[in-house]
Amino acid sequence: KNCKIKKMIYLSSSTIYQKNHFIGINKLKAEKHLIKNKLKFKYLQIWRPFNLIGSNQTQLTDHFHNYLFKVIFLEKRKFVLFNGNESDKRGYSSIDEFVKILQKYSSKNKSFINNFGNPNLISVKDIISIYNRVSNKKLGFELNHKFKSKKFNINSVKNLNKRKNIYSKTKSEHVIEHF
């Protein structure tokens, strides 16, 4: 209760910008609690990363690239009906790149809220093409697919003007190819 912390670094999530997203709602509550109690810290640093991918990932999340990987390479399914639209776009960043930037900025003695993401977007259709090239080579088949939605969604750090944005310098396509 009476503990004085010099620097609090909180890893939040870009899901705080989405309506009714379970993780986003809880991450935002945590952010608000930290901000309300910021006098307990000399410096408060909040990070909101977008679509991070690690090459040594052992757990698959519910993100599209992970779901697609699971469907093609683990389940070896030949057809999938997706909820979204093939024109949906995302900006992917490497966890390794994010960690380097996090270390650099976190060493500064100042408070901030930063978004981290990749303004270089890749479409869901292009992600499927990349995975299909690999599956064709390694498994001898490509995934056939359809999408339910006519409306497309663009999830980009570039759409945010509210806070400081720090951008990945790597193309999303390159990040996906090295997943």
Go through the PLM ranges and name each one:
Residues 15, 51, 121:
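PG/GG-rich flexible active-site loop of Rossmann-like NAD(P)H-dependent oxidoreductases
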Residues 22-23, 57-62, 126-129, 153-155:
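Short aromatic-enriched loop/helix-cap "lid" or pocket-rim segments at secondary-structure transitions
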Residues 28, 32-91, 95-103:
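NAD(P)-dependent short-chain dehydrogenase/reductase
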Residues 22-30, 133:
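Short, electropositive alpha-helical surface patch
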Residues 12, 48, 117:
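Short beta-strand/turn micro-motifs composed of small residues
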Residues 76-179:
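C-terminal substrate-binding subdomain of Rossmann-fold SDR/epimerase-dehydratase oxidoreductases
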Residues 1-25, 40, 44-45:
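Conserved Rossmann-fold NAD(P)-dependent oxidoreductase catalytic core, especially the SDR/UDP-sugar
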Residues 17-19, 55, 123:
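Short catalytic/ligand-binding loop motif for oxyanion handling, primarily in non-cytosolic enzymes
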